Design a protein with these regions (language model features):
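Solvent-exposed soluble domains appended to multi-pass membrane proteins
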Residues: 1-252
Length: 252
C-alpha cells in the first residue's frame, strides 16, 4: 500500500464510540458542535435526516449501501441509516456467517462477498460503507487462542498480555481480509476507490508515550484505487476524510 494515499485520522473518541467516528466520516460534521458525550445516532438522527456521503453521491446517480457483520440494531443503525440516505443495509441477520472469533464476533472475511454483492446489485455506480466487527472488545484476560499465529512479548502483566495477544491476532486476520478484498476489487475491474480506516484505538491501556507516532486519539487510514490517483499523505480530521474522497472523485 506504499504507493497509495495514507496517514493518520484524528478521531472523536478512544477505546469505544464507533458510532461517533462513523457519524463524522459519513456526514462531515464535527462532534464538537454537539452536546458533551452525545451520540447523534441516539438523539437527533432518531427523527431527523441529514446530508451525508450517501445523499451527495446519490445526487450523482450512485446507489448507497451499508454493511455490518453485527446486529442491525447495534447503535440503532437500523433506524438511522435510512436517515443518512442509505438505500440498503446488510447485517449479520442475513449473512451466512460460519467463522467467529473466540470472543464471539463475526470474522470479517464474510464481508468481501457482501461488498461484491452490493456492487453487483446495480448496473451503475455504488457507494458502500462497510463496518467490520472482528476486532471489537472486550478483550479476554485469559488465553483463549490456541497456538496464536502472532505472539506478544514485553508485557509482564499476564492479563494485559492475553488481551494484546487476542487483539493482534484479530488484526492479523483482518489484514488478510483487506488483501483479499483488494484482490477481488482488482479482478472486478470497475473504477474504484477503497478507503479503509480505524474507528478508534482499542481499550488496551494505551497512552501517547506508548505510541511510535501520533496520539491515542489518532488512527491510520489508507486509500487504494485502480484509477491512478496521485498519492497524498497526511494527518486529517475524521470529519474531513469524506471530503478527501469526494475531491478525488472530482465531486465538490
Amino acid at each position: 500500500m506504499k504507493g497509495y494515499s495514507s496517514g493518520q485520522l484524528s478521531m472523536p473518541s478512544y477505546g469505544a464510540g464507533t458510532a461517533n467516528s462513523e457519524f463524522e466520516l459519513i456526514t462531515g460534521m464535527n462532534l464538537d458542535h454537539f452536546g458533551a458525550a452525545e451520540y447523534p445516532y441516539k438523539t437527533v438522527l432518531q427523527d431527523t435526516t441529514t446530508e451525508s456521503m450517501a445523499t451527495v453521491l446519490k445526487n450523482y446517480g450512485y446507489k448507497a449501501h451499508a454493511i455490518h457483520d453485527n446486529s442491525a440494531a447495534f447503535y440503532d443503525r437500523d433506524l438511522v441509516f435510512s436517515q443518512l440516505g442509505f438505500d440498503t443495509f446488510t447485517t449479520k441477520e442475513s449473512m451466512n456467517i460460519k467463522k467467529w472469533t473466540e470472543n464471539g464476533w463475526a470474522k470479517d472475511q464474510i464481508l468481501t462477498g457482501c461488498i461484491m454483492d452490493s456492487l453487483d446489485s446495480t448496473k451503475g455506480q455504488d457507494y458502500v460503507y462497510c463496518i467490520s466487527v472482528q476486532g471489537h472488545g472486550d478483550y479476554p484476560t485469559t488465553q483463549i487462542i490456541e497456538n496464536p499465529e502472532i505472539t506478544v512479548e514485553g508485557i509482564e502483566d499476564e492479563a494485559l498480555k492475553n488481551k494484546y495477544t487476542y487483539y493482534v491476532n484479530q488484526v492479523y486476520q483482518m489484514d488478510q481480509f483487506v488483501g483479499k478484498l483488494v484482490k477481488a476489487l482488482q479482478q472486478r475491474g470497475e473504477p474504484t476507490i477503497l478507503c479503509m480506516y480505524g474507528d478508534h484505538l482499542p481499550s488496551l491501556e494505551i497512552e501517547d508515550e506508548d505510541l511510535t507516532y501520533g496520539n491515542k486519539y489518532q488512527t491510520s487510514y489508507f486509500m487504494w484505487d485502480n484509477i491512478g490517483l496521485k498519492k497524498k499523505d497526511g494527518t486529517i480530521e475524521a470529519y474531513d476524510l469524506g471530503s478527501e474522497v469526494l475531491n478525488k472523485c472530482n465531486i465538490h
